[in-house]
Every structure is written in C-alpha cells, then in structure tokens.
C-alpha cells in the first residue's frame, strides 16, 4: 500500500479536484473499518464507491484509455457509510497518472 500523509476527508461534501495530462489515472484509497462512501467524477462522469473493508487494504480505482490530453477528476466525500462501518473516512493515499 502506498505510504504518505494522504488526503483525508470525513465531512459530507469535502471535495478535491485534480487536473492532469495523460491517458488515465490510478487512485489508491485506504479501505478499512472506518471507510465511508465517495463519489468520483472523471471528465463529468460520476460513480459512487464504498471504502469499507473488514481489515485495512489498498483500494485501487483506475481509469484508462481516456484519450491523450487534459482530464479532470473530482473526489467528493459523501459523509455516509454502510452498516457495519464505524466511520465516513475517505483517505486518498496516492495517485498515479498513466502516460499517453
């Protein structure tokens, strides 16, 4: 799992926007018992993910073949969680831009 300070959010609506030049992107999140739900929007297309896991794991979410050029990723904490989760944490541990 990537190590570093990461970017943490627990509050509903907390958002980070990343603009990159490439063909794709990999986002590494920490999934564990405190994991919440997150919305990831890539070039205007949104999808929700659940970051809960019964033990700590690296959750890799990736997008490839976006086409060479500039792309925008928006990561938004939804402030919700599934039954069994003890938190609403969204922790982006690392990202990697895929070359064109």
PLM features per residue range, with description:
Residues 1-100:
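Glycan-recognition surfaces in beta-rich domains, encompassing non-catalytic CBMs
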């Amino acid at each position: 799992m990537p190590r570093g300070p990461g970017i943490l959010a627990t509050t509903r609506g907390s958002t980070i926007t990343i603009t990159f030049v490439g063909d794709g992107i990999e986002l590494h999140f920490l999934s564990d018992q405190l994991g919440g739900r997150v919305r990831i929007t890539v070039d205007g297309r949104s999808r929700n993910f659940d970051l809960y896991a019964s033990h700590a794991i690296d959750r890799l979410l990736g997008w490839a073949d976006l086409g060479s050029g500039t792309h925008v990723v928006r990561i938004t904490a939804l402030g919700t969680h599934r039954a069994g989760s003890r938190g609403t944490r969204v922790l982006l541990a690392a990202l990697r831009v895929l070359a064109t």
